[in-house]
């Protein structure tokens, strides 16, 4: 089998919490060597819980596989020297401190660039390096300031956050794309560059059609529950037993839906002839659909609608979602190759490469688990450079 696509790249991971670690875990899955630098107390998320497994936070375990951990106190001169040695030998450095923090230790991009011109240096912040550099930022704050909460929830009077730190995850993915792009360019020029990612810009980009409605049409979107601002029926609906999701994107699908529900005439109703009309008349549309859906349970409607190609599905909880993915043969849970049956149980990467698949080599590291080995390894690298 061919080596992993990012082997043997070395990533100096100075990141913490979620956005940075999600990025570096993705790079590690693709074969990069990840050295995670932690302060003496460890990554903040090591203490975030419950739940815990064997006294380890599942939050931390979920985004730190395929990494080695070294504890460094950057206020200590020797530890700072080790950190700088790591940065000078790395192909990639990822950090998500508030802008200016790395510069206080001489670990900022300009300081490292002189001795490592090929370094791809990635900085992730909440609000960017300019006017927002002093603003503290967690995902929730960005969801609020970035507009996501205003379009999420039952109505505009009940702003609601997403059920996961979605902006952090998206920032990690955008950082990964930026890093891979910079590495590709480095193959041509031999030069590294600075990749800057901020959560605010990530969210505005990820709002996609909602952002476009404001930028292009000067319309300010609002929350409409589980519905879609531009498509109907595209929502959750009550049935005789349980809820069902309908995602009807075409007039043909709407006609099929009405046929299956036994209300074929609804498709010819002047209020519902086109998607635009259905969006304008979503309230009476819901009333008619739920009246028909009440005749049977959600399981029945999902089965018969799916059979004719109308997008429909149950509203699963997380356990049901994993079970469904397993039924589809997607292997949603993997075990790391180190044989740790508890801490090594991992959510599968969604990246599937035919020739160079992702790997699940090791569980998330214990705090400082590899400190001695990494120090010795870096000392040898440094000695080799000085004698070269």
Positions of predicted regions on the chain:
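Aromatic-enriched alpha-helical interface/lid elements that frame and gate functional surfaces
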Residues: 232-308, 312, 388
């Amino acid at each position: 089998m061919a080596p992993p696509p990012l082997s043997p790249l070395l990533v100096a991971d100075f990141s913490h919490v979620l956005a940075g670690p999600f990025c570096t875990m993705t790079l590690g899955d693709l074969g990069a060597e990840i050295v995670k630098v932690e302060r003496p107390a460890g990554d903040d998320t090591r203490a975030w819980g419950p739940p815990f497994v064997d006294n380890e936070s599942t939050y931390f375990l979920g985004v730190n596989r395929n990494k080695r951990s070294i504890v460094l106190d950057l206020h200590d001169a020797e530890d700072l020297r080790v950190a700088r040695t790591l940065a000078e030998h790395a192909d990639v450095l990822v950090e998500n401190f508030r802008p200016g923090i790395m510069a206080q230790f001489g670990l900022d991009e300009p300081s490292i660039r002189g001795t490592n011109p090929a370094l791809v240096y990635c900085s992730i912040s909440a609000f960017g390096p300019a006017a927002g550099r002093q603003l503290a930022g967690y995902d929730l704050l960005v969801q609020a300031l970035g507009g996501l909460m205003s379009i999420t929830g039952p109505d505009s009077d009940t702003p609601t956050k997403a059920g996961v730190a979605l902006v952090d995850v998206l920032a990690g993915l955008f950082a990964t794309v930026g890093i891979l792009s910079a590495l590709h360019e480095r193959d041509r020029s031999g030069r590294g560059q600075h990749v800057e990612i901020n959560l605010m810009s990530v969210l505005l980009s990820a709002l996609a059609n909602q952002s476009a409605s404001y930028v292009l049409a000067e319309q300010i979107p609002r929350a409409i529950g589980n519905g879609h601002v531009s498509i109907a029926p595209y929502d959750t609906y009550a049935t005789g037993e349980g809820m069902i999701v309908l995602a009807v994107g075409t007039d043909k699908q709407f006609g099929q839906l009405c046929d299956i529900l036994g209300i074929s005439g609804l498709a010819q109703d002047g209020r519902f002839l086109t998607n635009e009309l259905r969006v304008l008349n979503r309230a009476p549309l819901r009333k008619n659909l739920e009246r028909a859906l009440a005749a049977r349970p959600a399981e029945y409607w999902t089965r018969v609608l799916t059979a004719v190609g109308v997008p429909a599905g149950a509203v699963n909880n997380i356990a049901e979602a994993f079970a469904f993915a397993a039924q589809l043969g997607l292997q949603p849970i993997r075990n790391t190759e180190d044989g740790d049956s508890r801490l090594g149980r991992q959510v599968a990467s969604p990246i599937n490469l035919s020739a160079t698949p992702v790997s699940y080599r090791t569980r998330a590291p214990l705090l400082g688990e590899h400190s001695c080995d990494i120090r010795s390894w870096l000392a040898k690298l440094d000695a080799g450079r000085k004698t070269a």
